[in-house]
Amino acid sequence: MKKMMIATLAAASVLLAVANQAHAGATLDAVQKKGFVQCGISDGLPGFSYADADGKFSGIDVDVCRGVAAAVFGDDTKVKYTPLTAKERFTALQSGEVDLLSRNTTWTSSRDAGMGMAFTGVTYYDGIGFLTHDKAGLKSAKELDGATVCIQAGTDTELNVADYFKANNMKYTPVTFDRSDESAKALESGRCDTLASDQSQLYALRIKLSNPAEWIVLPEVISKEPLGPVVRRGDDEWFSIVRWTLFAMLNAEEMGINSQNVDEKAANPATPDMAHLLGKEGDYGKDLKLDNKWAYNIIKQVGNYSEIFERNVGSESPLKIKRGQNNLWNNGGIQYAPPVR
């Protein structure tokens, strides 16, 4: 009887392992079969995911999607975008409507452990702040007692604002909206005294207002908001591809490799780690079930992390956001990537 039970358990373990292996590569197989990555993005946030007059999307989150496509197909254009509201985003990922969520989404324990999803890294370290009109004369968020606060529904902001006002013995009236641009319009019309959101989003929304210079972001950052890509939990293979797409961008910046000099660096790698990253030594693409030029393709077609940051939200963009925490670890920030080795 005991031997039979052991045999049954062993057989069940084998079947479970086979099932898990089959499930593990499901997303990559589906993506390769259809020929593109279906990427869930925000419904209109300058600097992160925003469509121009011709319908072309750009932004940090969009560039992550392009990077994944470059890694998988060697072609960053093989991606289709699904704009999603904060309420829609998780359902779209869980249902398989999108392969990847790259939509200024905060990494939290409940989302990572309780919703069947997995965060692959942090593309942008952020924090919640407040946007208000300069005529209000406010210098600090601690002067917002009694304020009416515009908030986007379905975001961490609702909870963090409630916690902040409670901790500081202040009262407020929340007014929620499904879309970020609706919140901005309500603020501009005077329906709210202030708008609460991730600071990066506040800068992005400010440039869409009629007179951006009249609006100020108060100095307080009231929370930690690590924003990053999200995939369905259980597909380790796809998780690794999305994770190492970001790591390739960060490693490239640290090594001084960018979209303009990547061919020169690949022709004469200065270090073994550089040779590994650019596919000149070793067979590291095999671990991801990708071509060994997967990282080269990301850097060549999309750029390193610095290029992506500066053109979308930094010095080369209308937002002019400083790197701050998003600098590399060796330049005063906390961005860091493991080596390809």
Swiss-Prot record:
Q: Does the keyword NAD apply?
A: no
One GO cellular component this record assigns the protein to is:
outer membrane-bounded periplasmic space
> What keywords would UniProt list here?
Amino-acid transport, Periplasm, Signal, Transport
Q: Which residues form a coiled coil?
A: none
Looking up PROSITE patterns in the UniProt record yields:
SBP_BACTERIAL_3
**According to its UniProt record, where is this protein located?**
Periplasm
What's one GO BP annotation on this UniProt entry? amino acid transport
Instruction: Please give the SUPFAM superfamilies that the UniProt record associates with this protein.
Output: Periplasmic binding protein-like II
The UniProt entry, under Pfam families, shows:
SBP_bac_3 (PF00497)
The positions making up the signal sequence are 1-19
Q: What does this protein do?
A: Probably part of the binding-protein-dependent transport system YdhWXYZ for an amino acid.
The similarity comment for this entry is: Belongs to the bacterial solute-binding protein 3 family.
PANTHER family named in the record: AMINO ACID ABC TRANSPORTER PERMEASE (PTHR30085), AMINO-ACID ABC TRANSPORTER-BINDING PROTEIN YHDW-RELATED (PTHR30085:SF7)
User: Could you tell me what this protein is called?
Assistant: Putative amino-acid ABC transporter-binding protein YhdW
Q: Which gene encodes it?
A: yhdW
